[in-house]
């Protein structure tokens, strides 16, 4: 049954200060980022409330609180607006005006038994220069990335999701070196079981310290022995906000520029931020290319090893002659030849990653050309295998997630060994074991291969390919959300223009 967050649009004033405090705390339930202060002045009770990291605290103190509390006048809304002429003063009477104002960086003042709240704009515009992501390349869409400042990261999330329905729970982890963690989700959307599971794992974490969100992920994921990531890590605020709006849970950590997103599925690691901004008939083929690239990266080199070692009869005659000529002076069997080149590729990749950006790119390109040419001329490897190795390496780069790309690259090594020992049977055995492992995996207790297993036909158009936006009126059924409807299907139908 579809549920929506309901908020009163009526004038709830006048109120007692304690009643207003209870009302605001109920609206910002489980969010520790609401500051609500009570003062008494000239026998009148005054409340000042705002979201701390959305405003400039020095300006609030100097331009608002000091004149307000040091004055000897008897305050009223009119007196405040006249005494503190900051040009942004307004009166709000309804909750559906006050709550968005708080999220937009306004400071609210309420005098007990008045008929309205006085609002001033103190938005914190002096933000740290947000830079681009280091591990996630963005072609279309916002380029900014998270920083090491938890306050800045929360500020960005609040700006992207401007609703009091956004719950931000404060949790502290680490006994010897405590770190602040924020559990973020939408109260009217996220599955309560998922939220409780994540909260329990964080609260029960009994460790001395946690250095980063990537380390935190290894403590709280479902299967720490698996090579595959079960939580999505991202440096992009828009990806995090989009996941929260889909009903997922995000975790931000102090001094960490990455967010954790759960639950995640195997297919979600092949979704790029560009998919959201591109047209469906452009995004779907690109997503299909990523899936095919993953398969090519895992099996292409093992297929070469198996065919040349055991099943050369399946190779076309002309190609077989070329392979024979290229391998004429190679003293090693194909399996050792492939493992050697794969290891060289990984060494060049790792060396390029540890060097400065421009130097690392040069080392990767020049080193690959030099090592490949020298290996062929020395008779250590064949030039045809270099082509297969290069295609496999390029295919692994198409994975938008760095963790998933690393997992795919590492899978090639056992697959090459199996192909060198058992041929095509070894490859099939390796793929079967891989599928069985993926079928057993979960993320926050939910199937990792959803919506393929268990099959959810309604979710296929969101996980494997994309349909036009006006066809995606439902959220993921497999997440068991409180509200599965994104928008009214009837209102999404095409309407005639006015002049038709």
Locate predicted features.
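Functional cleft and adjacent loop/helix regions within the main domain
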Residues: 311
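Generic detector of multi-pass transmembrane helix bundles and their immediately adjacent loops
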Residues: 303-306, 316-319, 331-500
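Membrane-embedded alpha-helical signal segments
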Residues: 1-299, 314-317, 438-500
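Short aromatic-rich membrane-water interface segments that cap or initiate transmembrane helices
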Residues: 283, 321-333
